[in-house]
Amino acid sequence: MKLSKKIISVILCVIMVFTMSAVAITANAKDDVTPVVFIPGIGQSQTYKYDDEGKQIASWNMLHVNTDFASYSIIDWVKMIRLVAGLIVTIAVQRDVVSESTIKGALEVLFVDHLRNADGSFVNNVVTPNYPCPISGYNEDARGIFNRRIPCQALVDEIGEDNVYCYNYSIFSNTFENAQGLNDYIENVVLPQTGSDKVILVPMSMGASVVNNYLNLYPDAGRVEKIISVVGAWQGSSVFADLMLADFDENAPDLVYTDAIQQIGVDAMTGSLINIAARILPKQEVDNLLYDIISAFVKTLIVPNTSLISLCPPDRYEEFADKYLQGEEHTETKAQADSYAKAQREVKERLEYQQEKFGTELYFIAGYNLGFGGGSGDFGFFKFFETQDTTNSDEVIEISSTAPGTSYVPAGTSFSDEYIADPSHHVSPDGSIDTSTAYFEKTTWYFNKQYHELTNNNIALNLAYDIAMNKVKSIDDCKDTYPQFNNVRNLKKLNRYLGDAEQVFKLGVLSAEDDAALRKAVADANAVIANTVIDPETDNKTTENMRSIMAELVAKYDLATEEVKKQLDYDGLMRGDYKPASEPDKTTVVLTSALGAVAKVLTLIFGKKGFGDFWSFIF
């Protein structure tokens, strides 16, 4: 333990040494600018693992699975063998014989880098660094990670990189320690370096829980000029409660036993394999095993980390606490979790207190009109859970949490005509949300069918940055530029194609005619990107047009070669997007068809049950 703590101390010292120039750098910070502090969400902070000599051996931004088998101890191998043996016996006897403790033991081996000692420190040398400087003081690696995960060049250009900070934290952490850390970061890093007495906080997703608890613990700090919430989880997310409490949708068996499994984003072949494999055990035994896995996961990784408990909505918290936080060993955890659940319930009063006492400006940017798992495809497995088709969300967090107080009906449905006709209600154009109940209606913006990953919606981000730069104060200031109700945008592919086009120009191989055509396509694309009133259909057409032109030029000038890649030190022109559609592999086609046919026959014979259920029914 002492050695681990020494290593951690050395690592943190190194981080501070390479950023000590931050104070000098920020001497150039603009006096009339309030520094901006981003508080990122899940997957936006990077965590590093070091060996006993302080050498980095791994890094991750979410879950890290320990596949370094050479590091396994004899006890670790025993735990893993117990699990594998238990699964084999379970299949053989058609009954779940794998205990929750066996699963927990295996999880402790696989996710050891997220485990904590009794004193709260991590078992291994694991650090999620908070750099004591603005992004101008970041090293190349840290700056690259920040730029990819929080694209904010427009803000940087306006206020200077010396006024942009980021407070990082691990998703497997402590909500109260994170809030205390944010306070220390503001008081001891941001304010002294910038000379400001205020900050602008930009919480993103889970980051809202950190800010909420910061305001809970330090209500009279008076340091916050603005809070600009970007899809913030102010009151958790029902789908996370579903996950932690193993509350599955009644139609979940359809996903497991039929071709509806493809709705969660798997391909036809994989879906058919799942359909077949799921029948190996009787349905009840599959349920038992699944419940044990979830319970073990929650007890191993979520209960020790109150940051994740903070994602449980306040109206589901008591059920969670009754199930997982009983007993003396959980006294401290429960006290903290109880306190934060109370903070969630009182979020309106807390924010109003900041507004009234300190003049804090409050802004919210949110996506809506999707069921859980119903947008990008990255969260398709959320379709397994109970609230997936009764919510109105950005596919991860419901709109009443990201835009607190907003009323809604399920995504894809509408309030009644009578409700909409009531002038006291302010219903969205699609009819699924009512903003009249939002706690801060005049400073809340909504993006229809926008999924949780907002980094590819430049308009949503530009809105946040214009608010930070005092260019926007309310929905009434910017009805034409930033309407309160806007639409989904995903510029990921279009931005890639534009970047590829710039590389083609560098080559200087195009004819005058082709060069002019590509430049026109780029200009047209940039014009669409600049349009702040989003038309998804136009976005999609523009993206496809850009792809088509690039594909034609890549083929015509033979640009998808190793020689060109080496010349440019860039491999974007070799994207599969630019290659002609190839004939599918015949073996894959045959296997997909065969497995699909087998899966359908099994569905006809066995329905939504396992093989064992059928035989027990017969005999």
What are these regions (language model features)?
Residues 1-11:
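Bacterial N-terminal signal peptides that target proteins for export
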Residues 11-19:
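Bacterial N-terminal signal peptides
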Residues 18-32, 614-615:
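Sec-dependent signal peptide cleavage junction
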Residues 30-202, 208-260, 371, 390-395, ...:
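N-terminal non-catalytic accessory region
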Residues 177, 181-184, 210-213, 493-496, ...:
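Extracytoplasmic/secreted proteins, especially bacterial periplasmic and envelope-associated proteins
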Residues 251-331:
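Alpha/beta-hydrolase-fold enzymes
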Residues 319-496, 572-601, 605, 609-612, ...:
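C-terminal subdomain of alpha/beta-hydrolase-fold enzymes, centered on the catalytic histidine
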Residues 487-578:
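Beta-rich interaction/scaffold domains
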